[in-house]
Amino acid sequence: MNALIDNPEALASGYLAMAQVFSYPDAGAWSRLTERGLVDPALTHETLEAEYLAAFEMGGGKATVSLYEGQNRPDLGRDGILQELLRFYEFFDAQLSEDDREYPDHLVTELEFLAWLCLQEHAAVRDGRDAEPFRRAARDFLDRHLAAWLPEFRRRLEATDSAYAQYGPALGELVEAHRSRLGEQAPQLGELQ
Protein backbone atom coordinates (compact mmCIF):
# COMPACT_ATOMS: atom_id res chain seq x y z
CA MET A 1 0.00 0.00 0.00
CA ASN A 2 2.83 2.43 0.83
CA ALA A 3 3.96 2.71 -2.80
CA LEU A 4 0.45 3.70 -3.82
CA ILE A 5 0.07 6.46 -1.25
CA ASP A 6 2.70 9.05 -2.01
CA ASN A 7 0.73 12.28 -2.08
CA PRO A 8 -1.77 14.08 0.16
CA GLU A 9 -4.70 13.57 -2.20
CA ALA A 10 -4.20 9.79 -2.19
CA LEU A 11 -3.81 9.80 1.60
CA ALA A 12 -7.07 11.73 1.93
CA SER A 13 -8.82 9.15 -0.24
CA GLY A 14 -7.42 6.37 1.92
CA TYR A 15 -8.58 8.03 5.14
CA LEU A 16 -12.05 8.65 3.71
CA ALA A 17 -12.29 5.03 2.56
CA MET A 18 -11.36 3.82 6.04
CA ALA A 19 -13.88 6.27 7.54
CA GLN A 20 -16.57 4.70 5.36
CA VAL A 21 -15.52 1.20 6.38
CA PHE A 22 -15.72 2.01 10.11
CA SER A 23 -19.00 3.96 9.87
CA TYR A 24 -22.25 2.26 10.79
CA PRO A 25 -23.20 0.20 7.71
CA ASP A 26 -26.77 1.22 6.97
CA ALA A 27 -28.17 0.17 3.57
CA GLY A 28 -26.83 3.28 1.81
CA ALA A 29 -23.37 2.87 3.32
CA TRP A 30 -23.31 -0.82 2.36
CA SER A 31 -24.15 0.10 -1.24
CA ARG A 32 -21.32 2.66 -1.35
CA LEU A 33 -18.86 0.23 0.23
CA THR A 34 -19.66 -2.53 -2.24
CA GLU A 35 -19.69 -0.17 -5.25
CA ARG A 36 -16.23 1.09 -4.31
CA GLY A 37 -14.88 -2.40 -3.77
CA LEU A 38 -14.29 -1.87 -0.06
CA VAL A 39 -16.63 -4.71 0.92
CA ASP A 40 -17.26 -7.95 -0.92
CA PRO A 41 -20.82 -7.80 -2.35
CA ALA A 42 -21.27 -11.42 -1.23
CA LEU A 43 -21.33 -10.03 2.32
CA THR A 44 -24.94 -8.89 2.54
CA HIS A 45 -26.00 -5.65 4.19
CA GLU A 46 -27.65 -7.59 7.00
CA THR A 47 -24.52 -9.67 7.61
CA LEU A 48 -22.23 -6.62 7.58
CA GLU A 49 -24.55 -4.80 9.97
CA ALA A 50 -24.60 -7.80 12.32
CA GLU A 51 -20.79 -8.00 12.14
CA TYR A 52 -20.51 -4.29 12.98
CA LEU A 53 -22.85 -4.60 15.95
CA ALA A 54 -21.05 -7.70 17.24
CA ALA A 55 -17.58 -6.18 16.86
CA PHE A 56 -18.19 -2.63 18.05
CA GLU A 57 -21.45 -2.34 19.97
CA MET A 58 -22.96 -5.49 21.46
CA GLY A 59 -20.24 -8.12 21.36
CA GLY A 60 -22.49 -11.16 21.04
CA GLY A 61 -21.09 -12.62 24.25
CA LYS A 62 -17.57 -11.35 23.54
CA ALA A 63 -15.84 -8.10 24.43
CA THR A 64 -16.48 -5.32 21.96
CA VAL A 65 -13.77 -3.25 20.30
CA SER A 66 -14.26 0.42 21.10
CA LEU A 67 -14.16 2.89 18.22
CA TYR A 68 -13.39 5.71 20.68
CA GLU A 69 -9.88 6.92 21.48
CA GLY A 70 -10.82 7.84 25.04
CA GLN A 71 -11.99 4.31 25.78
CA ASN A 72 -8.84 2.84 24.24
CA ARG A 73 -6.59 5.12 26.31
CA PRO A 74 -8.20 5.14 29.77
CA ASP A 75 -4.91 6.10 31.42
CA LEU A 76 -5.19 9.60 29.91
CA GLY A 77 -8.81 10.24 30.82
CA ARG A 78 -11.43 10.69 28.16
CA ASP A 79 -12.31 14.27 29.12
CA GLY A 80 -8.76 15.46 28.48
CA ILE A 81 -8.63 13.66 25.15
CA LEU A 82 -11.96 15.15 24.08
CA GLN A 83 -10.85 18.66 25.05
CA GLU A 84 -7.58 18.33 23.14
CA LEU A 85 -9.34 16.99 20.05
CA LEU A 86 -11.85 19.84 20.14
CA ARG A 87 -8.97 22.34 20.32
CA PHE A 88 -7.38 20.69 17.27
CA TYR A 89 -10.64 20.90 15.33
CA GLU A 90 -11.36 24.48 16.44
CA PHE A 91 -7.86 25.69 15.54
CA PHE A 92 -8.49 24.67 11.93
CA ASP A 93 -12.16 25.74 11.94
CA ALA A 94 -13.14 22.12 11.31
CA GLN A 95 -16.75 21.89 12.38
CA LEU A 96 -18.23 18.63 13.61
CA SER A 97 -21.50 17.84 11.91
CA GLU A 98 -24.58 18.78 13.90
CA ASP A 99 -26.32 15.73 12.44
CA ASP A 100 -23.50 13.34 13.28
CA ARG A 101 -23.91 11.76 16.67
CA GLU A 102 -20.27 10.71 16.98
CA TYR A 103 -17.95 12.13 19.59
CA PRO A 104 -14.75 13.97 18.65
CA ASP A 105 -12.70 10.90 19.63
CA HIS A 106 -14.58 8.44 17.38
CA LEU A 107 -12.30 6.69 14.89
CA VAL A 108 -14.36 7.95 11.95
CA THR A 109 -14.13 11.57 13.14
CA GLU A 110 -10.35 11.31 13.52
CA LEU A 111 -10.00 9.69 10.07
CA GLU A 112 -12.13 12.41 8.48
CA PHE A 113 -10.06 15.14 10.14
CA LEU A 114 -6.84 13.60 8.82
CA ALA A 115 -8.40 13.42 5.35
CA TRP A 116 -9.33 17.10 5.66
CA LEU A 117 -5.75 18.02 6.66
CA CYS A 118 -4.42 16.07 3.67
CA LEU A 119 -6.82 17.87 1.34
CA GLN A 120 -5.77 21.23 2.80
CA GLU A 121 -2.13 20.30 2.19
CA HIS A 122 -2.96 19.31 -1.39
CA ALA A 123 -4.81 22.59 -2.01
CA ALA A 124 -1.95 24.63 -0.53
CA VAL A 125 0.60 22.93 -2.80
CA ARG A 126 -1.67 23.31 -5.83
CA ASP A 127 -2.20 27.01 -5.11
CA GLY A 128 1.46 27.76 -4.34
CA ARG A 129 0.82 28.39 -0.64
CA ASP A 130 2.77 27.04 2.33
CA ALA A 131 1.58 23.49 3.06
CA GLU A 132 3.89 22.94 6.03
CA PRO A 133 1.32 23.98 8.69
CA PHE A 134 -0.97 21.18 7.50
CA ARG A 135 1.89 18.67 7.49
CA ARG A 136 2.89 19.67 11.03
CA ALA A 137 -0.71 19.43 12.19
CA ALA A 138 -1.11 15.97 10.65
CA ARG A 139 2.16 14.80 12.22
CA ASP A 140 1.14 16.15 15.62
CA PHE A 141 -2.39 14.74 15.35
CA LEU A 142 -1.10 11.31 14.40
CA ASP A 143 1.49 11.30 17.19
CA ARG A 144 -0.88 12.54 19.88
CA HIS A 145 -3.98 10.68 18.78
CA LEU A 146 -4.57 8.09 16.08
CA ALA A 147 -1.10 6.51 15.99
CA ALA A 148 -1.07 6.47 19.80
CA TRP A 149 -4.13 4.25 20.15
CA LEU A 150 -4.18 2.39 16.84
CA PRO A 151 -1.87 -0.49 17.89
CA GLU A 152 -4.14 -1.55 20.77
CA PHE A 153 -7.27 -1.03 18.65
CA ARG A 154 -5.77 -3.20 15.90
CA ARG A 155 -4.68 -5.90 18.33
CA ARG A 156 -8.20 -6.17 19.70
CA LEU A 157 -9.88 -5.88 16.29
CA GLU A 158 -7.66 -8.47 14.63
CA ALA A 159 -8.31 -10.89 17.50
CA THR A 160 -12.01 -10.96 16.62
CA ASP A 161 -13.52 -13.28 14.05
CA SER A 162 -15.36 -10.29 12.59
CA ALA A 163 -15.32 -9.31 8.93
CA TYR A 164 -13.89 -6.02 10.22
CA ALA A 165 -10.66 -7.70 11.41
CA GLN A 166 -9.32 -7.58 7.84
CA TYR A 167 -9.33 -3.77 7.89
CA GLY A 168 -6.90 -3.42 10.81
CA PRO A 169 -3.77 -4.08 8.73
CA ALA A 170 -4.93 -1.74 5.94
CA LEU A 171 -5.57 1.06 8.43
CA GLY A 172 -2.17 0.46 10.02
CA GLU A 173 -0.45 0.59 6.62
CA LEU A 174 -2.22 3.83 5.77
CA VAL A 175 -1.09 5.51 8.99
CA GLU A 176 2.46 4.16 8.56
CA ALA A 177 2.58 5.48 4.98
CA HIS A 178 1.40 8.91 6.10
CA ARG A 179 3.86 9.11 8.98
CA SER A 180 6.67 7.97 6.70
CA ARG A 181 5.74 10.63 4.18
CA LEU A 182 5.78 13.22 6.96
CA GLY A 183 9.31 12.17 7.86
CA GLU A 184 8.49 10.26 11.00
CA GLN A 185 10.58 7.34 12.10
CA ALA A 186 7.39 5.76 13.31
CA PRO A 187 7.36 2.51 15.23
CA GLN A 188 5.86 -0.15 13.03
CA LEU A 189 2.17 -0.20 13.87
CA GLY A 190 1.89 -3.60 12.21
CA GLU A 191 4.17 -5.13 14.83
CA LEU A 192 1.65 -5.81 17.52
CA GLN A 193 2.79 -6.47 21.05
Curated annotation (Swiss-Prot):
The molecule here is called Selenate reductase assembly chaperone protein
Any idea which UniProt keywords this protein has? Chaperone, Cytoplasm
Report the sequence similarity comment from the record. Belongs to the type II DMSO reductase enzyme chaperone family.
Compartments it resides in: Cytoplasm
Extract the Pfam families matched here.
Nitrate_red_del
Q: Name one GO cellular component term.
A: cytoplasm
Q: Which NCBIfam families would you find in this protein's record?
A: DMSO_red_II_cha
Question: What role does this protein play?
Answer: May function as a system-specific chaperone protein essential for the assembly of an active selenate reductase SerABC.
Q: Does the keyword Chaperone apply?
A: yes
Superkingdom of source: Bacteria
